[in-house]
Regions:
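ATP/nucleoside-binding phosphotransfer catalytic cores, i.e., glycine-rich phosphate-binding loops
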Residues: 155, 160, 171-174, 221-294
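ATP/NTP phosphate-donor binding region
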Residues: 2-70, 74, 111-126, 137-147
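Short aromatic-centered micro-motifs
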Residues: 168, 190, 246
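Catalytic core of DAGKc-family lipid kinases
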Residues: 102-181
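Short glycine-rich anion-binding loops that position phosphate/pyrophosphate groups of nucleotides
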Residues: 20, 77-79, 102, 189-191
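Short glycine/serine/threonine-rich phosphate/pyrophosphate-binding segments
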Residues: 24, 78-84, 192-197
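Short, acidic/small-residue loops that bind anionic groups at enzyme active sites
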Residues: 90-108
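Gly/Ser/Thr-rich active-site loops/lids in small-molecule metabolic enzymes
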Residues: 176-180, 184-221
Length: 294
């Protein structure tokens, strides 16, 4: 039983749908209608509010993160990843409604919506804190760009047609040089995503570790390296590779030159996930592995 019930401390709940998943906004409508019946305030952006019949308070996206105590994210794991950074900065818990394939983050299935919302109202849920990663990119002009990831930070060769030699430093000490298509730095949450597809290890969600994994390395001995959350990573390249891509949680953020340096460490903020389901991590993992074998 959680000490903070909706309607008690959490009085302002934002609804963020993925329009590519909830195309007709019927799921959004169901959730907003439930809020109306429960005398709770639901907030959406104007472009959503004008397309549903149920009453919601229309605010800008920026105001949504300023006002709301918690967020309902409708779509799937990818949709949760898209809001994780902004929510973590404001320390806002997220609960996901899964309209995609089997996911690790979205906890509510469409057929469970009303029952799950009632559990939230009664405080029958837990809040999991998920470790995040921070990437600081230093440009040749000494400009700094900072990003935060819940899943992973990837540096890949982009449109460059050849392998790239990636120099990896751990805690400012040279670790190795990897000839590869790219490097994945993954949190425990992201270890079951791109990292797993690239042959990296699975980390349990609560582990105080993260992992760096080469993508298609051109050497037999190149393996993943598991680091403690106190370690730092520096990624640079040793040749004139053009248009290398930096992706954060699967989204392209910027292109890099060999003169850019990428520093990665554990972030100070965390993503808070509201968990209602009885499904455990390894239950979901087994289902996902079976799905991939089909």
């Amino acid at each position: 039983m959680n000490a903070y019930k909706w309607g008690d401390r959490m009085k302002h709940i934002g609804i963020i749908p993925n329009r590519l998943k909830d195309t007709d906004l019927k799921v959004t409508e169901r959730i907003a209608t439930w809020f109306n019946k429960s005398n709770l305030s639901a907030y959406t952006t104007p472009d959503i509010a004008e397309h549903i019949q149920a009453h919601t308070i229309a605010v800008s996206e920026k105001e949504l993160y300023e006002i709301c105590d918690s967020l309902i994210v409708i779509g799937g794991d990818g949709t949760i990843l898209s809001v994780a950074e902004a929510a973590s900065i404001k320390d806002i818990p997220i609960v996901g409604v899964n309209l995609g394939r089997l996911g690790f983050l979205a906890d509510i299935e469409p057929q469970e919506i009303e029952v799950s919302l009632q559990k939230l109202l009664e405080g029958v849920y837990e809040i999991e804190e998920r470790m995040m990663l921070k990437a600081t990119i230093i440009s040749p002009e000494d400009e700094k760009y900072v990003f935060h990831a819940l899943n992973d930070i990837n540096v890949t060769r982009g449109s460059f047609a050849r392998l790239v030699e990636f120099e990896i430093r751990i805690n400012n000490e040279l670790c190795d040089v990897y000839p590869a298509d790219g490097m994945i730095v993954s949190s425990p949450t992201g270890s079951t995503a791109y990292n797993l597809s690239a042959g990296g290890p699975i980390l349990v969600p609560h582990a105080n570790t993260y992992v760096v994994t080469p993508i298609c390395p051109h050497t037999l001995y190149a393996k993943s390296i598991i680091l403690s959350d106190h370690d730092t990573i520096q990624i640079a390249t040793l040749e004139e590779a053009k248009d290398m891509a930096l992706s954060i949680d699967g989204r392209l953020k910027m292109y890099l030159t060999p003169q850019h340096v990428v520093h990665i460490e554990r972030a100070t903020q965390v993503t808070k996930l509201i968990k209602l389901s009885e499904r455990k991590f390894f239950d979901i993992l087994r289902e996902k592995i079976v799905e991939r074998r089909r």
